[in-house]
Curated annotation (Swiss-Prot):
Keywords: Cuticle. GO terms for molecular function: structural constituent of cuticle. This is Cuticle protein 16 isoform b. It comes from the Eukaryota. It comes from Limulus polyphemus (Atlantic horseshoe crab).
Length: 70
């Protein structure tokens, strides 16, 4: 039996400066999945990763966004 513990974190702040979201998930055999996205007036960034807790496999991506969406 594999138990999943999904968790979302939405700080919910927005002061005209930015916003961010985070997601984390793991199971009893140490597989994991996480991501975050953040945006602000000058652009933003994101990161996503998943893999095993033993360090054998890690797959992910990351990136930056300019204020004009590129």
């Amino acid at each position: 039996v594999v138990l999943h513990r999904p968790g979302y974190y939405y700080p919910g702040y927005y002061y005209g400066l930015g916003m961010s979201t985070q997601y984390r998930n793991g199971d009893t055999i140490q597989n994991y999945n996480f991501q975050y996205d953040e945006d602000h007036l000058a652009g933003g960034s994101y990161r996503r990763e998943h893999g095993t807790g033993y360090g054998n496999v890690k797959v992910g991506s990351y990136g930056l966004r300019d204020a004009d969406g590129r």
